[in-house]
Amino acid sequence: MGIENTRFLVVDDFSTMRRIVRNLLKELGFTNVQEAEDGVEALAKLRADIFDFVVSDWNMPNMTGIELLQNIRADAKLKHLPVLMVTAEAKKENIIMAAQAGASGYVVKPFTAATLDEKLKKIFQSMNK
């Protein structure tokens, strides 16, 4: 499977942000992108279909990104999935919390395609080791 065939799930309660992330991924050559508007919907999609990568916002109603991450890491079928946390929160304690919960990476909004590309490459490299 080529890296461009990676199946992404973009999770954010703000549709504009989902569209921005989708467009940035498209710029980077990733066209297989689905969306969910919160952690509850994301978890249902992850359990019903096959995805290779999750890009999730932190602050969402119903189930936050960190709760989604914890659910993914606790699920035997999903725990291998890389999860990139996207948030407006640049607080050190949030970065530490995300790392402790098993986030594969962390990016602060707003960000560019180059920043996203750099984070994704780091995660893909660590997956291939």
Q: Model-flagged regions — what are they?
A:
Residues M60:
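Receiver (REC) domain active-site loop signature in two-component systems and cognate sites
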Residues F111-L120:
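C-terminal output helix
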Residues A44, I66-K79:
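Short amphipathic alpha-helix used as the core "switch/output" element in two-component signaling
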Residues R22, E67, A90-G105:
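Alpha4 helix (beta4-alpha4-beta5 surface) of REC/receiver domains from two-component response regulators
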Residues S15-Q34:
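Two-component/phosphorelay signaling modules centered on CheY-like receiver
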Residues D49-V55:
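Active-site beta3 strand of CheY-like receiver
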Residues E35-A44, G65:
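Helix N-cap/capping motif at the beta->alpha junctions
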